[in-house]
Amino acid sequence: YGLEKEKAPSLKQNKSKHVNAIEYHEMLKDKDSVVIDVRNHYEVDIGRIEPPEGGATFLNPEMRNSREFPKWLNLPETKKQLEGKRVMMYCTGGIRCERASALISQMERVGDLKETKGIAMVRGGVDRYLKTFPESGGFWKGKNYLFDLREAQMAEKEGELETTSKCCACERAWSKYEGK
Protein backbone atom coordinates (compact mmCIF):
# COMPACT_ATOMS: atom_id res chain seq x y z
CA TYR A 1 0.00 0.00 0.00
CA GLY A 2 2.99 2.28 -0.03
CA LEU A 3 2.66 2.87 3.72
CA GLU A 4 5.69 3.33 5.94
CA LYS A 5 6.56 0.17 7.86
CA GLU A 6 5.25 1.49 11.18
CA LYS A 7 1.93 2.46 9.54
CA ALA A 8 1.45 -0.83 7.70
CA PRO A 9 -1.48 -2.87 9.07
CA SER A 10 -0.79 -6.02 11.06
CA LEU A 11 -2.30 -9.19 9.64
CA LYS A 12 -2.09 -10.68 13.15
CA GLN A 13 -4.43 -8.01 14.55
CA ASN A 14 -6.88 -8.25 11.66
CA LYS A 15 -10.42 -8.83 12.98
CA SER A 16 -11.98 -9.68 9.62
CA LYS A 17 -13.84 -12.90 9.01
CA HIS A 18 -13.40 -15.34 6.13
CA VAL A 19 -16.75 -16.68 4.95
CA ASN A 20 -17.53 -19.32 2.36
CA ALA A 21 -19.10 -18.32 -0.96
CA ILE A 22 -22.61 -19.44 0.01
CA GLU A 23 -22.58 -17.39 3.23
CA TYR A 24 -21.07 -14.43 1.36
CA HIS A 25 -23.81 -14.69 -1.29
CA GLU A 26 -26.48 -14.48 1.44
CA MET A 27 -24.72 -11.53 3.08
CA LEU A 28 -24.93 -9.63 -0.23
CA LYS A 29 -28.71 -9.51 0.28
CA ASP A 30 -28.33 -7.44 3.48
CA LYS A 31 -29.10 -3.73 3.03
CA ASP A 32 -26.95 -2.91 6.06
CA SER A 33 -23.83 -4.07 4.22
CA VAL A 34 -21.43 -2.46 1.80
CA VAL A 35 -19.31 -4.51 -0.59
CA ILE A 36 -15.93 -3.20 -1.73
CA ASP A 37 -14.20 -4.49 -4.84
CA VAL A 38 -10.51 -4.17 -3.93
CA ARG A 39 -9.25 -5.02 -7.41
CA ASN A 40 -7.89 -2.49 -9.91
CA HIS A 41 -10.42 -0.42 -11.86
CA TYR A 42 -9.75 -2.22 -15.15
CA GLU A 43 -10.61 -5.54 -13.48
CA VAL A 44 -13.84 -4.05 -12.13
CA ASP A 45 -14.69 -2.71 -15.59
CA ILE A 46 -14.90 -6.16 -17.17
CA GLY A 47 -16.73 -7.86 -14.29
CA ARG A 48 -17.96 -7.39 -10.74
CA ILE A 49 -20.45 -8.44 -8.11
CA GLU A 50 -23.75 -6.63 -8.47
CA PRO A 51 -25.68 -7.07 -5.22
CA PRO A 52 -29.42 -7.60 -5.59
CA GLU A 53 -31.83 -4.69 -5.41
CA GLY A 54 -32.46 -3.86 -1.76
CA GLY A 55 -29.21 -5.59 -0.77
CA ALA A 56 -25.66 -4.45 -0.07
CA THR A 57 -24.33 -1.21 -1.53
CA PHE A 58 -21.50 -1.68 -4.04
CA LEU A 59 -18.44 0.55 -3.51
CA ASN A 60 -15.75 0.87 -6.16
CA PRO A 61 -12.53 2.60 -5.05
CA GLU A 62 -11.59 2.99 -8.75
CA MET A 63 -7.94 2.25 -8.06
CA ARG A 64 -5.15 1.96 -10.58
CA ASN A 65 -3.11 0.13 -7.94
CA SER A 66 -3.33 -0.91 -4.28
CA ARG A 67 -1.38 2.13 -3.06
CA GLU A 68 -4.50 4.21 -3.76
CA PHE A 69 -6.68 2.19 -1.36
CA PRO A 70 -5.57 3.92 1.90
CA LYS A 71 -6.24 7.33 0.32
CA TRP A 72 -9.74 6.23 -0.73
CA LEU A 73 -10.44 4.78 2.73
CA ASN A 74 -9.48 8.07 4.38
CA LEU A 75 -11.90 10.17 2.32
CA PRO A 76 -14.70 11.53 4.56
CA GLU A 77 -17.39 10.23 2.16
CA THR A 78 -15.88 6.72 2.23
CA LYS A 79 -15.74 6.69 6.03
CA LYS A 80 -19.39 7.77 6.15
CA GLN A 81 -20.40 4.95 3.78
CA LEU A 82 -18.67 2.35 6.00
CA GLU A 83 -19.88 3.66 9.36
CA GLY A 84 -22.21 1.23 11.12
CA LYS A 85 -22.28 -1.15 8.14
CA ARG A 86 -21.03 -4.67 7.66
CA VAL A 87 -18.04 -4.22 5.37
CA MET A 88 -17.69 -6.98 2.78
CA MET A 89 -14.90 -7.17 0.27
CA TYR A 90 -13.62 -9.36 -2.51
CA CYS A 91 -10.76 -9.69 -4.94
CA THR A 92 -9.66 -12.32 -7.44
CA GLY A 93 -8.28 -14.92 -5.04
CA GLY A 94 -8.31 -13.38 -1.56
CA ILE A 95 -4.79 -11.97 -1.17
CA ARG A 96 -5.62 -8.29 -1.70
CA CYS A 97 -8.57 -8.64 0.70
CA GLU A 98 -6.22 -9.78 3.44
CA ARG A 99 -4.32 -6.50 3.25
CA ALA A 100 -7.38 -4.30 2.68
CA SER A 101 -9.31 -5.83 5.57
CA ALA A 102 -6.27 -5.51 7.85
CA LEU A 103 -6.11 -1.80 7.01
CA ILE A 104 -9.81 -1.28 7.82
CA SER A 105 -9.40 -3.28 11.02
CA GLN A 106 -6.42 -1.12 12.01
CA MET A 107 -8.32 2.09 11.26
CA GLU A 108 -11.13 0.95 13.55
CA ARG A 109 -8.67 -0.05 16.28
CA VAL A 110 -6.90 3.34 16.35
CA GLY A 111 -10.09 5.37 15.98
CA ASP A 112 -9.57 6.60 12.40
CA LEU A 113 -12.82 4.91 11.39
CA LYS A 114 -16.04 4.66 13.38
CA GLU A 115 -16.96 1.11 14.21
CA THR A 116 -18.47 -1.09 11.53
CA LYS A 117 -20.67 -4.18 12.00
CA GLY A 118 -17.70 -6.35 11.11
CA ILE A 119 -15.49 -7.05 8.13
CA ALA A 120 -15.98 -10.10 5.93
CA MET A 121 -14.28 -11.43 2.83
CA VAL A 122 -15.16 -14.35 0.60
CA ARG A 123 -12.70 -17.21 1.19
CA GLY A 124 -10.91 -17.85 -2.10
CA GLY A 125 -12.12 -14.63 -3.73
CA VAL A 126 -14.10 -14.37 -6.94
CA ASP A 127 -12.45 -17.57 -8.14
CA ARG A 128 -14.13 -19.59 -5.37
CA TYR A 129 -17.40 -17.62 -5.66
CA LEU A 130 -17.71 -18.48 -9.37
CA LYS A 131 -16.79 -22.11 -8.74
CA THR A 132 -19.53 -22.27 -6.10
CA PHE A 133 -22.12 -20.81 -8.49
CA PRO A 134 -20.82 -22.23 -11.80
CA GLU A 135 -24.03 -22.01 -13.81
CA SER A 136 -25.65 -18.81 -12.59
CA GLY A 137 -22.59 -16.90 -11.43
CA GLY A 138 -24.51 -15.84 -8.33
CA PHE A 139 -24.49 -12.03 -8.28
CA TRP A 140 -21.44 -11.89 -10.55
CA LYS A 141 -21.74 -9.99 -13.86
CA GLY A 142 -19.13 -10.12 -16.63
CA LYS A 143 -15.69 -11.71 -16.45
CA ASN A 144 -13.16 -12.13 -13.67
CA TYR A 145 -9.81 -10.92 -15.00
CA LEU A 146 -6.97 -13.37 -14.35
CA PHE A 147 -3.27 -12.61 -14.39
CA ASP A 148 -2.32 -15.73 -16.34
CA LEU A 149 -2.79 -17.27 -19.80
CA ARG A 150 -6.48 -17.98 -19.11
CA GLU A 151 -7.06 -14.19 -19.11
CA ALA A 152 -10.56 -14.40 -17.64
CA GLN A 153 -13.01 -16.58 -15.77
CA MET A 154 -16.80 -16.46 -15.96
CA ALA A 155 -19.92 -18.35 -15.00
CA GLU A 156 -21.16 -21.02 -17.37
CA LYS A 157 -24.43 -19.17 -18.01
CA GLU A 158 -26.42 -20.20 -21.04
CA GLY A 159 -26.73 -17.53 -23.71
CA GLU A 160 -24.58 -14.47 -24.16
CA LEU A 161 -22.18 -13.06 -21.62
CA GLU A 162 -23.38 -9.85 -20.04
CA THR A 163 -20.77 -7.29 -21.10
CA THR A 164 -20.05 -4.78 -18.36
CA SER A 165 -17.48 -2.52 -20.01
CA LYS A 166 -16.67 -0.52 -23.13
CA CYS A 167 -13.63 -0.11 -25.33
CA CYS A 168 -11.76 3.01 -24.18
CA ALA A 169 -11.12 4.04 -27.80
CA CYS A 170 -14.44 3.46 -29.61
CA GLU A 171 -16.93 3.03 -26.71
CA ARG A 172 -18.34 -0.27 -28.07
CA ALA A 173 -19.23 -3.03 -25.62
CA TRP A 174 -16.03 -4.88 -24.77
CA SER A 175 -15.22 -7.49 -22.15
CA LYS A 176 -11.55 -8.22 -22.65
CA TYR A 177 -8.70 -6.49 -20.89
CA GLU A 178 -5.35 -6.51 -22.65
CA GLY A 179 -2.64 -4.98 -20.51
CA LYS A 180 -0.22 -4.42 -23.35
Could you say what each language-model-derived stretch is?
Residues 1-17, 25-33, 40-88, 95-180:
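Rhodanese-like catalytic fold shared by cysteine-dependent sulfurtransferases
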